[in-house]
A protein has these predicted regions:
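PLP-dependent amino-acid enzyme catalytic core
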Residues: 1-404
């Protein structure tokens, strides 16, 4: 295994954090062919530790039931939208309720390898709950620096797992360099591992997220025509592209999917870079989306490179469209997701209309987290029901109300 710059290909020492010292590119682990070949023979089983040869860790990954989430064919929405083969990878069924559990298991293994007493991370919510969950399982301390104003369910979840949570004003507002500096400084001061889940700062954690692509390839089998991902910092999308490249090297798949990233138009750093033809993603001075999981003002150029290399696109959606699809996924598919999970599905009508996907293609939407993570829509609906006067104890009254 080597740690190479994605741009200049200069090698860095394993364990290096941050960007390439020669050209400021993003570092990434790369594996020899004989290691990648295990993807053709890996035995089915629980958890993602069976893929450990393709992760930059030696310590076993703690297992709480993460991975092997279902790949579900759409029951109704696909037909309504005009797609014959729409599937949902439901990552909300991971132990803490989001795909970040794959990162949580990986960051804990990295902390154990480093001999750290604990780990520190910055989070908009799902990383916090995953880090807290897997630190608890491994007996490590967990410190979360949380952006104020995030959904209370995510805060409660992290606290319930024993994490120390410190709201820090403007933890993202100082840009990626500022976020990196506070993480590294706090980690050094406490003897903790700096577990910022963003490849330009920590190039190792996203490797565990690649396991989503391995599982999709095993279930289909092969690769979908299109994989649609919500995008905040860009690690989820990048990890899937890396996974599919490895699957192709191993001979497991014979073609690669087109990667589609989806952002809110109220927090669109990747969307703007893609539309402008930029080589880098310029951090924005704001992120005003109400979709908590993707309300991030900066995205790494690794996601931009993955979209372009795959022949994919970046789509923008209105927050309201994600909330409507969140409701419809529950009512029409029986899948309760947070708004960030609904973003890929909300982008499908526009992608179809613009010819970026075809009605006959196999399209997989990655549903990143469960509905309880950000349940404002459900809370509003419940409040509306609670505000109604109760019906009389009468059959006709109940039937009449049910039919109304």
């Amino acid at each position: 295994m080597k740690l190479l710059c994605a741009d200049c290909r200069k090698e860095a020492a394993m364990g290096t954090l941050g960007r390439c010292g020669a050209c400021d590119g993003i570092l990434r682990p790369e594996y020899p062919d004989e290691v990648v070949a295990v993807l053709a023979t890996v035995a089915p089983g629980p958890g993602i530790d069976r893929y450990r040869p393709l992760f930059p860790v030696t310590a076993p990954l703690p297992f709480l039931g993460e991975g092997d989430t279902p790949l579900l064919p759409s029951a109704r929405l696909g037909r309504t939208l005009g797609l014959e083969r729409l599937l949902f990878k439901n990552e909300g069924l991971n132990p803490s309720g989001a795909f970040k559990d794959r990162a949580g298991a990986t960051m804990v293994a990295l902390a154990l390898d480093a001999g750290a007493k604990g780990l520190v991370t910055v989070s908009s919510g799902n990383t916090a709950t995953a880090a807290a969950t897997y630190c608890a399982a491994a007996g490590l301390r967990c410190l979360i620096l949380l952006e104020p104003g995030n959904p209370p369910a995510k805060l409660r979840q992290a606290l319930a797992m024993g994490a120390k949570v410190l709201p820090v004003e403007g933890v993202y507002a100082h840009g990626p360099d500022g976020t990196r500096d506070i993480i590294f400084g706090v980690a050094e001061g406490l003897g903790y591992y700096p577990a910022f889940v963003w490849a330009p700062v920590n190039p190792y954690i996203l490797e565990g997220i690649k396991s989503v692509s391995y599982e999709i390839a095993a279930r289909l089998p092969g690769a979908p025509d299109v994989l649609v991902c919500p995008v905040g910092g860009g690690d989820m999308l990048t990890a899937q592209w890396r996974g599919y490249l490895e699957l192709q090297r191993a001979g497991v798949i014979d073609r690669l999917p087109r990667m589609v990233g989806v952002q809110s138009v109220a927090a669109p750093p990747l969307l703007e870079a893609f539309r402008n033809g930029d080589a880098r993603v310029t951090p924005l001075p704001y992120a005003r989306s109400r979709i908590s999981g993707i309300n991030v003002p900066f995205t790494g150029e690794h996601a931009l490179a993955a979209v372009r290399a795959s022949g994919g696109v970046v789509a923008g959606i209105a927050d309201e469209d994600a909330f409507e699809i969140q409701r419809r996924l529950g009512a029409e598919e029986g899948i309760w997701v947070e708004p960030a999970s609904a973003a890929p599905v909300a982008a499908l009508p526009g992608l179809l209309a613009e010819g970026h996907i075809g009605s006959h293609e196999t399209v997989v939407c990655l549903l990143s987290g469960a509905g309880f993570k950000d349940a404002l829509l459900a809370a509003d609906m419940a409040d509306a029901v609670s505000a109604r006067p109760p019906l009389p104890f009468d059959v006709e009254a109940v039937v009449s109300a049910a039919l109304a």
